[in-house]
Swiss-Prot record:
PANTHER family: EUKARYOTIC TRANSLATION INITIATION FACTOR 3 SUBUNIT 11, EUKARYOTIC TRANSLATION INITIATION FACTOR 3 SUBUNIT K
Any Pfam family: CSN8_PSD8_EIF3K
Name the record gives this protein: Eukaryotic translation initiation factor 3 subunit K
Gene3D superfamilies listed in its UniProt record: ARM repeat, domain 1, Winged helix-like DNA-binding domain superfamily/Winged helix DNA-binding domain
GO biological process, one term: formation of cytoplasmic translation initiation complex
Lineage of the organism: Eukaryota, Fungi, Dikarya, Basidiomycota, Ustilaginomycotina
Function field: Component of the eukaryotic translation initiation factor 3 (eIF-3) complex, which is involved in protein synthesis of a specialized repertoire of mRNAs and, together with other initiation factors, stimulates binding of mRNA and methionyl-tRNAi to the 40S ribosome. The eIF-3 complex specifically targets and initiates translation of a subset of mRNAs involved in cell proliferation.
Region (Disordered): 114-135
GO cellular component: eukaryotic 43S preinitiation complex; eukaryotic 48S preinitiation complex; eukaryotic translation initiation factor 3 complex
Amino acid sequence: MASETASASQWVSPSSRPQHIEQLISGVDRYNPQNLDVLHDYLAQQLDDGSYDLLANLAILKLYQFNPADFNYVVVINILLKALVAAPLPDFNLCISLLGEAPLPTVPVKAEKEATTTDADNAGSLSGDDDDDEVVEKPKDVASAGHLTDPLIVRLSQLSTLLFQARFREFWSTLASESYSDVRDYAAKISEFENAARRVALNSVKGSFTSISEKRIANYLNLSGSQLAEFINAQDGWKLADGTVSVPANPDNEIKATVIREEISLDQMHKFLAQAQSPLLRA
């Protein structure tokens, strides 16, 4: 419970947040578009040093929502990439929800015309009247993130889903695919991006295993050999030896027998037995 409280505290107010940013996003100044440059500089700091501050980044997206003329596509992509590797927290979806009014392409309500017939028209066709077929518009099945169809944002959304669902091998193979080269170009400019994704995998393993094979965790982390050993041994409490990785004990992976003991007083037992008797015996 203490660790969960500490994690929530870091989410609301990370220790890396400067005092002037704390004051800015805690008051009405967060809605002042003149503060965008300050928030942009703070985001650049996060990209450089690997820190992360969701609430400050959400403040940027909120200002874009109120001031579409200030919208900066590159800033949005960087914010989404930082939120992506915060899984399993819902940060990515929170960011997407604030892009609803952004100047980006969206799924059209009616995107494609198809020739279809109504039930009445079908009945007419059976009687030989085929000239009244009505052409109606049907929604097109378009890949989207929320309702946004910007190709890069859709790809980020797909990566976010893979991380959230703990499909780590698929995450790495998708990220390495040719169609995701633009994602890799942006991610390469973010300090510790891949290691942040690896920590998502470690947290998932930490809650489910007491030990795991080296081969399996290598696939989860997209590392092998000395790089894998170096990364694992750098984690507090983790050890790699003889092809097996030992996971540190924590409340989620400890196996404990649960003993439930209920004490019933003699008085309570007397009342229970009295209520269980048939009316005939009570008389």
